C-alpha cells in the first residue's frame, strides 16, 4: 500500500513540475499569448532578435514618447515612428505590457516567485514595463507618486535579481 502511495506522489510531482515549466511563460504576460480576435496582432511579439534591434529599442526608449489619456504609447519622432520595428514596439507597449498598478503589482509578485531566469521576451517586456512605470512615477503627484514608485522599485528589484541569477554559472533557464 505504501509503495502505491509513493508512486502516486512521484507521478503527481512529475506532472506538477512539467506543467509549471511548460506554462510559466504565459503567466507573466498573458496578453502576449491571447490577442483579441478583432485585431491583427501577432502572437507573442518580440522586439529584439539581434544586436541592431536591441540598439533600436534603446533609441525608442530615448526618443520622446507620448502617452495619451487612454494610455496608448507612441513615439513622437516621425522618422523613428515610421520604422517597421516601431510598429512592433507600439504593439508590445499598447497591448502586452501591464499599465495599471494592480497589474504591475501582479507582475512583480509573479517575477519574485519565477523559477530560473527570464526568457528573452519576458525580460524585454519587464524592462518596458519598468520604463512605463518610471514615466508614470515622474508624472504623478502625492500619494499616487508613492504608489508608482513602490511598483518601480519592485520591478527593478525583480530585474536585478534575474540579472544576478543569469550571471551565475550553471543556472538553468
From Swiss-Prot:
Where it sits in the cell: the answer is: Secreted
Q: Which UniProt keywords apply?
A: Secreted, Signal
Q: Which GO terms describe its cellular component?
A: extracellular region
Signal peptide, first to last residue: 1-17
Which family does the UniProt entry place this protein in?
Answer: Belongs to the FAM180 family.
State what protein this is by name: Protein FAM180A
Instruction: Give the gene symbol.
Output: FAM180A
